[in-house]
Amino acid sequence: MQFPLASAHEDSPPAGLKLRDSCNRCAVSKIKCSKEKPACARCAKQDKVCEYSATKRAGRKRGSRRHNNPVPSPTTQDLPTAAPSTCPTFLEDPETIPLSPRPPFESYPDLFPGIFSIGDDPLIATPITLDTFSFPFDSFSASPISLPTLDVSDGDHLPDAVPLNHLNHPGDRTDVARATALLASDHASASSMDPAAGPQRPPDEPSSGPICGFIRALGLLNGLSSPAWPTSHHPGLDPRPSSRSIMAENEQTVRAISEMLHCQCFDDGYLLAILSMLILKVLSSYATLLRQTPGPDGDGVSWDNSTPPPGEQGAGVDGEDHCRTIAQQILGQLHRVQRLVSILSQRFNIPGGRARTPDSTAGPDLLSSIETLFPVPGSMLEQMEGLLRKRLRTLSAEIVDILR
């Protein structure tokens, strides 16, 4: 392909042609050309003819843009015909677009006063209050909003407003804590006094395991009624439990202790000591109930609301029969308590129950055990076992004397 050449001796290139920046000899040799016309430095030094070829893309002709481009027309005249009238709100004239009804700007003459003034700025010079803004803030809430820090005078018109410092009063926190404690105690006493209810235990917790055993034993010890009852009684203040409720509560406690002792995981000496105290409390409850029941001589205090007071029944046959009935019921429960004492004695003799001297040749796992490092003293368990058997013999002898 031949390109039109322009030498140094020729005139300026014809209109519409553009010459290359590099001459032909420099372009073929791929050497940077000095781009000097009519002859570059390399061609002038070698005394060669310097020729510049025309570029492959000729320049645009002058005046072509003016003839090719159409005359622009206003876009506002073509929009209604070019696009369908699906959204007339955006295509119509802004003056014809319907606006939502709003209050005119003149209805808020005091909104941000002096904000466009140059001389002074009242928003900075004076503090901002609710009087400065004439906007109806109360329409956003169901009840009026009181801001005492902004306007103290408006607080007198709100009789139902509660001061914030009233919530931090120490007496209120004490009342809330007392009410919570009373509700918890009422629930515990109602569940313990119900004969139809089973042994007290958490509903979702398993009935086995040392930790669960401790929790269950402590719950039974806390929920068991106190065996001692004051002689002065006010019927309107503290109603006494009946003998039936006390017998049912003790029976449930004995059944729960039996379930825990029959589990092989309850070999912990501390847990056995707690169960021993539970049995002692049950025996004390039986003894107190037996001694406060009116006997043939009219002594004692009536626990059961169905029996007449001691002053009215005296040494009648009804009082003697009631005392014998209570004694027979307690005697029917003592054989279960005696069985628990026998099981406890066997558990006291196992390695986990009694204290023993740590062996120096034992492994690290045995020495790290709490029962090995800090065991329950054997003398304490022996005293507990002797006390249980003594209380059981004493109570049995009293019942036999009543039934003779």
Swiss-Prot record:
Endpoints of the signal sequence: none
Bias kind Polar residues: ranges: 74-83
Residue stretches of biased makeup (Basic residues): 57-68
SUPFAM superfamilies per record: Zn2/Cys6 DNA-binding domain (SSF57701)
A Gene Ontology biological process term: aflatoxin biosynthetic process
A single GO molecular function term of this UniProt record: DNA binding
Pfam family, one: AflR
Record-given protein name: Agnestins biosynthesis cluster transcription factor AgnL10
